[in-house]
């Protein structure tokens, strides 16, 4: 690896130092040739992170990751520091608990997500939660060449809307729904400590603790994945087709008025699917409640090849979502609170990308709980997972200039007015998780084998059949 002092532009060198470039570097190829067996994941991921952090610490001063790696290395080969071989074997012998500490360092260094330079670099060679479904379907063709993160979003578009409103939804969940529970709302990139090929970034997690710069997840931790629905954004105007149905929901919050509100647009976000039928992939919320069956749509039967979908549907059909209808600040002196709660039979669609997104979050946070001392003996170490659907309206001249969530939490003047929040628990069967991760890991391995001369093994524990790895 080139000395950072010899480079004309150290920052440019660092931003291009991806996992793929590391695997192709002469130093790595020479080191691999001298091993008596192919290198393995996740040790190779941690070796790469050590090399990257060595560069970063030259101008960031952050030495925690490299210092911890050095404590795992048995011998120092030279005055310049341990060799790649010594680092690799130290990391290969590391326990899952020690690997979780390393991943916690990475998470703490990458907070800020898309605004954090290191967060962007680390996506290379990682199957992220947003890429899991496409990897299963099409292979990891973009995993080693991820598209650059764009922060230049049109203000009036759905991406900018979601980014703008996300903090408001976090405030509603933390303050109004969970009652000021201990929460963390700023996460870095969380790499799976046990395999090094999966990674996630969380929106919000409650019932977490802090240990210095680290976040400690516990067996009480609850993940909230936030979705702000741009297609339901409406104005307080008789000419807006959504407004009359919202008015009915606000005046009388109940299942019937909510059904009318959801179906006030051409492509509703909730799909009715009777038992034994296959949902479409169109949107991420389903129901089996006959009250939602407003039009006759033929659906295919669940059959061969739909085992994972059937298992996931069976696990989630009994889920009860909770709808929180918010008060109108124009009628309440600017205060936005919870007006009413309505339980509804709405659950996640296991054919949609968001199901796989929360599946991977569940898996990785569970790893952190198990290997960082956050779980109590005899208790399930798995976190709870919810997907949050938030609905907003545009501000009107009748709204006070200053609006608050609850009595004192100021709502940013640039943010639209929240009108309702739907919290949907997600159940993730173990068999579905195992099969999904096994398929994705096999796809990653096959792609890496065809792309790199020094492709590292994937941990055999990810596969249903250990013969999937050498």
Curated annotation (Swiss-Prot):
UniProt-listed Pfam families: Viral_alk_exo (PF01771)
Keywords: Decay of host mRNAs by virus, Early protein, Endonuclease, Eukaryotic host gene expression shutoff by virus, Exonuclease, Host cytoplasm, Host gene expression shutoff by virus, Host mRNA suppression by virus, Host nucleus, Host-virus interaction, Hydrolase, Nuclease, RNA-binding
Source species: Epstein-Barr virus (strain GD1)
Predominant localisation class: host cell
Zinc-finger as UniProt keyword: no
Cellular location(s): Host nucleus; Host cytoplasm
Entry GO MF terms: DNA binding; endonuclease activity; exonuclease activity; RNA binding
The protein's name in its UniProt record: Shutoff alkaline exonuclease
EC code: 3.1.-.-
UniProt record, GO biological process: symbiont-mediated degradation of host mRNA; symbiont-mediated suppression of host gene expression
Upper lineage: Viruses, Duplodnaviria, Heunggongvirae, Peploviricota, Herviviricetes
Gene3D superfamilies: Herpesvirus alkaline exonuclease, N-terminal domain (1.20.120.860)
Function as written in the Swiss-Prot or TrEMBL entry: Plays a role in processing non linear or branched viral DNA intermediates in order to promote the production of mature packaged unit-length linear progeny viral DNA molecules. Exhibits endonuclease and exonuclease activities and accepts both double-stranded and single-stranded DNA as substrate. Exonuclease digestion of DNA is in the 5'-> 3' direction and the products are 5'-monophosphate nucleosides. Additionally, forms a recombinase with the major DNA-binding protein, which displays strand exchange activity.
One Gene Ontology cellular component annotation held by this UniProt entry: host cell nucleus
RNA-binding found in the keyword field: yes
Subunit structure: Forms a complex with the DNA polymerase, the DNA polymerase processivity factor, and the major DNA binding protein.
Family of the protein in this entry: Belongs to the herpesviridae alkaline nuclease family.
Residues flagged as site, Required for function: 166, 203, 225, 227
InterPro entries with a match to the protein in the record: Herpes_alk_exo (IPR001616), Restrct_endonuc-II-like (IPR011335), Viral_alk_exo (IPR034720)
